[in-house]
């Protein structure tokens, strides 16, 4: 297809996508009209668990992903990666129909700004009962923040400019998410302009047009996109040879949400093995570990709640909609719930460690290549979400997807994660609506989870085991 014809088709498909983002995900769900609903609601409740609602959701997702995968096969004009800013602008006004985290961010910041409550130590329940927005915390009312001080300060920074107005703060947090999304798209392009210029536009499009990315950032405003933008900034600095800046940016990412600390060992190994002698490497690894630790510890120290009260550690309790939850449900009748949890944790964490170790062994001769830390980062984050996350959430895929697009749209990493983003969206109506239609699937939690987790993971595993690995050239 010629570029001119491709451009015409692109604009037509952009119009189709915009109509779906507006008609299915925004038109009936204006944030300004719905944000006062207590307790907060989701897509299924807003559409009254209707067949029309579930059909619109599934059809919309399928069409959006159809457009998405079509784009990745075509020659595209340079402005293509930035068309989704229109979609993001539409979703900016939408109620977060897939998760209530946006409200929790705002409530914890209210506690800090108005009542001087440390969000890392204090749950929303500590706010005065008279606070008009307290009940929007819903099931998270007794949970302190599992995030880092960079995120809490960022949320606080937009509280005063809107004079503490709750709706204004929600929109400001959405603005932060969209700004981080735009920064991520630019960083992907600039990284690829150095490592693989021929992939630049497709890499940007692969991230920017992905429906899960757009819905979880522009609509639901998860702070994961801020963490991801800083992770990509760290990779950008690594690619540009700015070693200490790379460590600083990764530390800032960790101080938004702690999961990206899993990338730190691979970044440090790469930076170390660039050096010419063993002496320089040994010295550097001690220096890099020490300085990175200080970059993380010093900012969090004034707000740290103590190990016993740290929400990051408490978040591992319980499980749902995940492989771990399915295993616990299968074993608890024989072993009891606590033992079943222990068995599944040891099993899945062991499998995760084995996969990461095997990948590290495969890449042992490429530790000074730019693709090595990116591939290892993808491996540890992707398989964490797929295997060991006690509760699976679709936005967890932002972590690994941001790295997958840097490895090329024909790579196993990208294809598997792209399919994962599709199944993560399609499984939502099953868990939220279909199981309500058929209460047997709610009452028989094991069967309900087997079906849901199969929808979520089996297509992904098929792609992984049937796709040949591509090897990036040395950069």
What are these regions (language model features)?
Residues 175-179, 195, 204-232, 237, ...:
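Multi-pass, polyprenyl lipid-linked donor-dependent membrane glycosyltransferases
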Residues 13-14, 61-71, 171-195, 228-229, ...:
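Transmembrane-helix motifs of polytopic, lipid-linked glycan transferases
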Residues 214-217, 233-237, 244-268, 379-387:
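Membrane-interface alpha helices of multi-pass inner-membrane proteins
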Residues 50-54, 149, 153, 163-186, ...:
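Loop-to-helix entry region of an early transmembrane alpha helix in multi-pass inner-membrane enzymes
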Residues 263-293:
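Perimembrane helix-loop-helix junctions
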Residues 76-178:
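Intramembrane catalytic core of multi-pass membrane enzymes that act on lipidic substrates
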Residues 75-82, 185-210:
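Transmembrane-helix signature of polytopic, membrane-embedded enzymes
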Residues 2-56, 273, 283-288, 296-384, ...:
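Transmembrane helical bundles and short interhelical boundary loops of multi-pass, membrane-embedded
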């Amino acid at each position: 297809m010629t570029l001119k014809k491709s451009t015409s088709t692109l604009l037509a498909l952009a119009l189709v996508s915009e109509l779906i983002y507006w008609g299915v995900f925004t038109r009936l769900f204006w944030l300004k009209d719905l944000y006062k609903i207590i307790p907060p609601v989701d897509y299924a409740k807003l559409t009254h668990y209707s067949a029309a609602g579930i059909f619109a959701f599934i059809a919309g997702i399928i069409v959006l992903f159809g457009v998405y995968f079509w784009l990745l096969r075509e020659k595209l004009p340079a402005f293509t990666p930035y068309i989704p800013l229109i979609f993001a602008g539409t979703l900016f006004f939408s109620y977060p129909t897939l998760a209530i985290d946006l409200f929790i961010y705002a409530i914890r910041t209210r506690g800090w700004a108005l009542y001087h409550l440390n969000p890392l130590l204090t749950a929303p329940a500590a706010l005065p009962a008279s606070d008009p927005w307290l009940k929007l915390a819903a099931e998270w009312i007794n949970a302190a923040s599992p995030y880092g001080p960079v995120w809490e300060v960022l949320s606080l920074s937009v509280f005063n400019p809107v004079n503490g107005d709750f709706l204004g703060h929600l929109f400001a947090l959405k603005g932060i998410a969209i700004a981080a999304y735009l920064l991520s798209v630019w960083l992907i392009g600039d990284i690829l302009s150095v490592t693989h210029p021929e992939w630049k536009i497709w890499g940007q499009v692969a991230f920017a047009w992905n429906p899960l990315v757009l819905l979880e950032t522009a609509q639901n405003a998860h702070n994961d996109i801020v963490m991801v933008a800083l992770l990509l900034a760290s990779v950008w600095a690594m690619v540009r040879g700015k070693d200490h800046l790379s460590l600083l940016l990764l530390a800032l990412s960790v101080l938004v949400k702690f999961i990206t600390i899993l990338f730190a060992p691979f970044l440090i190994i790469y930076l170390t093995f660039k050096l010419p002698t063993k002496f320089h490497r040994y010295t550097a690894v001690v220096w890099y570990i020490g300085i990175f630790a200080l970059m993380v510890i010093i900012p969090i120290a004034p707000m740290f709640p103590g190990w016993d009260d740290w929400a990051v550690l408490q978040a591992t309790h319980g499980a749902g909609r995940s492989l771990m939850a399915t295993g616990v449900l299968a074993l608890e009748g024989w072993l009891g719930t606590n033992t079943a949890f222990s068995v599944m944790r040891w099993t899945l964490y062991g499998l995760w460690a084995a996969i990461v170790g095997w990948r590290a062994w495969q890449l042992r001769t490429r530790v000074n290549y730019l693709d090595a830390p990116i591939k290892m980062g993808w491996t540890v984050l992707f398989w964490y979400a797929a295997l060991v996350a006690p509760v699976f959430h679709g936005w967890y895929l932002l972590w690994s997807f941001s790295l997958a697009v840097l490895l090329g749209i024909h790579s196993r990493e990208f294809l598997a994660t792209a399919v994962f983003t599709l199944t993560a969206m399609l499984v939502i109506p099953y868990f939220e609506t279909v199981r309500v239609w058929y209460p047997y699937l709610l009452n028989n939690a094991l069967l309900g989870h087997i079906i849901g987790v199969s929808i979520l993971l089996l297509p992904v595993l098929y792609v992984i085991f049937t796709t040949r690995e591509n090897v990036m050239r040395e950069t």
